[in-house]
Amino acid sequence: MQAVSAIVRDKRGRVLSVGKNSYTKTHPLQARAAQEAGEPYKVYLHAEIDALIRVRNPDKAHTIHVYRYDKAGNPVKAAPCKICQRVIREWNLQVFHT
């Protein structure tokens, strides 16, 4: 299992929320976005969507940072999938990833 994390920040760089991927939890936003992206079977929470649903004040969200780590804990290349890209575009956020 690879660990993926996402951090949503405001314009000043303050952390608004942190999310991580889950192989057991889902959310209606994840299910809707997966359906719209043509991948309805990808219903388990992605880190980006987990971070977004945890933001208390969406109007302050400015950027999202995405990180992925291998089994040894080393950072590896990460980028939002097409499901998460759709939601990030809806939120009009800047994206930074490893």
Positions of PLM-derived features:
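Zinc-dependent deaminase catalytic domain
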Residues: 1-98
